[in-house]
Amino acid sequence: MSSKRAKTKTTKKRPQRATSNVFAMFDQSQIQEFKEAFNMIDQNRDGFIDKEDLHDMLASMGKNPTDEYLDAMMNEAPGPINFTMFLTMFGEKLNGTDPEDVIRNAFACFDEEAIGTIQEDYLRELLTTMGDRFTDEEVDELYREAPIDKKGNFNYIEFTRILKHGAKDKDD
């Protein structure tokens, strides 16, 4: 049985397939802007962003990045960075959930005693009167699974952990 691919080519790390709906996350003008940015970073024009491309791009901006810094940037991707992977990574950053510390710090702004909790009535008032206002029904839904103690303290540190990692088992 002959293989169409040479075995020597299989040692190269192949890009992981990005979700097919990645292009649906952005409108056409945004995709064009990302393509222009990708092309500016892809200094050697091989269709992939590699460590050397990042180094050259940063050097052209007057930066002198260390190998460790460049490695950390490259390790953000699960494989070689083609345009689809580049778009997927930005989509996750722009449209995905916020990092855990960002969510926690947003709650902490309203925790005057810095103890990791917010009084449930106060939080309800904030959620229904500020920013993108929640309805009472939406707050009720939020509170259904929220970590609220018997005194009515909403534990936002635990809530943030639940948002990012899921609820603990009841057996714990």
From Swiss-Prot:
It comes from the Eukaryota. Residues 29-64, 98-133, 134-169 form the EF-hand domain. GO terms for molecular function: calcium ion binding; myosin heavy chain binding. The modification Phosphothreonine is found at T19. Phosphorylation increases the actin-activated myosin ATPase activity and thereby regulates the contractile activity. InterPro entries: EF-hand-dom_pair, EF_Hand_1_Ca_BS, EF_hand_dom, Myosin_RLC. Ca(2+) binds at D42, N44, D46, D53. Residues 1-20 are annotated as: Disordered. Pfam families: EF-hand_7 (PF13499). One of its GO terms (cellular component) is cytoplasm. The modification Phosphoserine is found at S20. Residues 1-16 have a biased composition (Basic residues). Keywords: Calcium, Metal-binding, Motor protein, Muscle protein, Myosin, Phosphoprotein, Repeat. Myosin regulatory subunit that plays an important role in regulation of both smooth muscle and nonmuscle cell contractile activity via its phosphorylation. Implicated in cytokinesis, receptor capping, and cell locomotion. Myosin is a hexamer of 2 heavy chains and 4 light chains. PANTHER family: MYOSIN REGULATORY LIGHT CHAIN 2 (PTHR23049). This chain binds calcium. This is Myosin regulatory light chain RLC-A. It comes from Rattus norvegicus. The gene is Rlc-a.
